[in-house]
């Protein structure tokens, strides 16, 4: 039996605020969403240092070693979407839209849109 795909309501490019952890209160833009792990990588938040070794690939130029600072993933439960100056929860609404077929005829369809729970507006 196929396993159900995990859903994450935060999308790449969203501005989020960290609500728990060592970077609580920090805001940043989502760089990457790791859906299977239910984690997000936020720009400038949860930065960690990685010590890397010089890798030489048989005479060719390899990677340089040293200490690299990069963002580490944060669980989605520890971030909230920033919208309209404050944080908000995310909801979903089904909107009815009219679509057009290649032959010119139209038909009704539904699409799912993200909404702000605080204002009710589409995100």
Curated annotation (Swiss-Prot):
Alphabetical UniProt keywords: Ribonucleoprotein, Ribosomal protein, RNA-binding, rRNA-binding
InterPro entries: KOW, Rib_uL2_dom2, Ribosomal_uL24, Ribosomal_uL24_CS, Ribosomal_uL24_KOW, Translation_prot_SH3-like_sf
GO cellular component: ribonucleoprotein complex; ribosome
Disordered: annotated segments: 100-123
SMART domains: KOW (SM00739)
Purpose of the protein: One of two assembly initiator proteins, it binds directly to the 5'-end of the 23S rRNA, where it nucleates assembly of the 50S subunit. One of the proteins that surrounds the polypeptide exit tunnel on the outside of the subunit.
HAMAP family assigned to the protein according to its UniProt record, in alphabetical order: Ribosomal_uL24_B (MF_01326_B)
Protein name per Swiss-Prot or TrEMBL: Large ribosomal subunit protein uL24
Gene that specifies this protein: rplX
């Amino acid at each position: 039996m196929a396993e159900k795909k995990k859903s994450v309501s935060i999308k790449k490019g969203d501005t989020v605020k960290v609500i728990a952890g060592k970077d609580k209160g920090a805001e940043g833009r989502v760089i990457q969403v790791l859906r299977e792990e239910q984690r997000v990588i936020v720009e400038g938040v949860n930065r960690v240092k990685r010590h890397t070794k010089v890798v030489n690939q048989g005479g060719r130029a390899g990677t340089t070693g040293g200490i690299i600072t990069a963002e580490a993933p944060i669980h989605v439960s520890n971030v909230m979407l920033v919208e309209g100056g404050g944080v908000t929860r995310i909801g979903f609404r089904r909107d009815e839209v009219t679509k057009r077929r290649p032959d010119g005829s139209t038909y009704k369809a539904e699409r799912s849109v993200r909404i702000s729970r605080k204002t009710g507006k589409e995100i």
